[in-house]
A protein has these predicted regions:
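N-terminal membrane-proximal hinge/A-helix region immediately C-terminal to the signal-anchor transmembrane segment
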Residues: 1-96, 111-124, 143, 155-159, ...
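Cytochrome P450 I-helix active-site segment
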Residues: 5-10, 114, 118, 219-226, ...
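Conserved cytochrome P450 K-helix E-x-x-R motif and the immediately C-terminal K′/meander segment
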Residues: 17-36, 291-332
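Conserved cytochrome P450 K-helix/beta-meander segment immediately N-terminal to the heme-binding cysteine loop
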Residues: 66, 322, 344-371
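Cytochrome P450 heme-thiolate monooxygenase catalytic core
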Residues: 70-75, 93-94, 109-261
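Short, small-residue alpha-helix embedded
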Residues: 258-271, 403
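Cytochrome P450 heme-binding "Cys pocket" and the immediately downstream C-terminal segment
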Residues: 274-276, 373-375, 393-429
Length: 441
């Protein structure tokens, strides 16, 4: 006899949709508290199973990964945006693309990116005046777009920066889980969907313009875009410009926003915890002095590393991930039907008191070698895990640390909001602009 996971029955037909729309984060927390590590419910007509224990997560992402694909839920939601890019592609095509792109994120290549990251950060900070109030999350989104454009695609995004940032923001807002329209098909002409469609058209225009401009260059850099174009132009492959477009969209939308959020949440957490901030600043002074940070400096900055890790634990930019079972499966003592959508929330696991003492407090000092060795493998997974872990993990961590270090060398950040609140969009977005007053050090 099949034993389904426990969970809320919700309303007739609607199931748990309304409670999830009202407050996804509290809903996740309530499910874990009331029903445990494996919870089944109905959302928007789909069987959803929340899995929130590291042991089960490891089975899904690693041991039994062949039985859990990206699935129809993610493809319905994101297929328009990233097509067959790395985020959604499966099987041999995914494997070939992953192998093709992975060298662009090897350590040797990252070393070349580091100087550009610091240069772009200094250029952005040059626009800030001591004593002024800035919208930190917006500033950092513009910065990470500029960094990504220069390092991976070899172009200066200055002219299209605002358009790109607004487009990315509109697309992310389309997937705010707190809006009923998110669960409607994209072709239904709601105001949000119309804005989304315009943003998608803008995104395609910008991407194809970048491709055309690169092909017209006589002397182009050896970067990710060059690798992609060479693969498309190779007669031995079946790749097309649409494939190229999908991978560029995946990298841009998947990479710049999560990095900007990690930076935002690190800087605001430090601003609200003066003792932790003082420790990081003292470390930067001792190791760097007045020099710019380099990639070779990062191993000598453990307090900076801990500050970033703790911010990504407390406020994980990727707050959940999804999989779909492609056959009936057993998770723990429960049966999961074929076609169930699994939601694996970092939001719940990263705040679990079984793994993290005082889980809702920012405590970077917790990240000792002994503590990390004691953690279950998937108690902390800000970059997903298994063979489909984020391809840009090293790039994103290096970028976040270099940017945070560079900015702390120049400014103090006075957080202007009483506290942070969040919106569940494609990523963990601040519910309102993050205003900070910057003062030169």
């Amino acid at each position: 006899m099949s034993t389904l996971p426990p969970g809320p029955s919700g309303l007739p037909v609607a199931g748990s949709t309304l409670s999830f729309v009202r407050d996804p984060f509290s809903t996740y927390e309530r499910w874990a508290e009331e029903y445990g590590d494996i919870v089944a419910t109905n959302i928007a007509g789909r069987t959803f199973v929340m899995v929130a224990h590291p042991e089960h997560i490891e089975r899904i992402l690693v041991t039994d990964q062949q039985h859990y694909g990206k699935g129809s839920f993610q493809r319905d939601q994101l297929g328009d945006i990233v097509g067959d890019g790395l985020l959604l592609s499966e099987g041999e095509f995914w494997h070939e693309q992953r192998n093709r792109l992975q060298p662009e994120f090897f350590r040797e290549q990252l070393t070349q990116y580091a100087t550009m990251m610091v240069d772009e950060t200094r250029a952005r900070a040059d626009n800030w005046t001591s004593g002024e109030t800035i919208t930190l999350n917006s500033e950092l989104q513009h910065l990470t777009l500029a960094i990504m454009a220069r390092t991976l695609f070899g172009f200066d995004i200055e002219d299209a920066e605002g358009q790109f940032a607004n487009t990315a923001r509109t697309i992310s807002e389309r997937f705010n889980l707190s809006h009923v329209s998110t669960y409607l098909a994209a072709w239904i002409p709601t105001p949000r969907n119309r804005r989304y469609r315009r943003a998608m058209n803008n995104l395609d225009t910008v991407i194809y313009d970048v491709i055309e401009a690169r092909r017209a260059q006589d002397d182009s850099p050896n970067d990710l875009l060059a690798t992609l174009i060479a693969a498309v132009d190779d007669p031995e492959t079946d790749l097309t410009d649409e494939t190229l477009r999908d991978e560029i969209a995946t990298v841009i939308l998947g990479g710049h926003d999560t990095a900007a959020l990690a930076m935002t949440y690190t800087l605001t957490a430090l601003a609200r915890h003066p003792d932790a901030e003082a420790e990081v600043r003292a470390e930067l002074d001792e190791v760097l002095g007045d020099d710019d940070p380099t990639v070779t400096d990062l191993p000598a900055l453990p307090r900076l590393d801990a500050a970033v890790k703790e911010a990504m634990r407390l406020h994980p930019p990727a707050y959940t991930l999804f999989r779909e079972s492609n056959r009936p499966m057993k998770i723990g003592e429960y049966d999961v039907p074929e076609g169930a959508t699994l939601t694996i929330p970092q939001w719940v696991v990263h705040h679990d008191s079984r793994w993290f003492e005082s889980p809702w407090e920012y405590q970077p000092d917790r990240w000792t070698d002994e503590f990390e060795a004691s953690l279950p493998e998937y108690a902390y997974f800000p970059f997903c895990g298994g063979k489909r872990h984020c391809i840009g993990m090293r790039y994103g961590l290096m970028e976040t640390k270099l940017v945070v270090a560079t900015l702390l060398q120049r400014f103090r950040f006075d957080f202007q909001l009483p506290e942070l609140s969040f919106a569940a969009a494609l990523t963990l977005q601040p519910a309102e602009p993050v205003s900070v007053r910057v003062t030169t050090v």
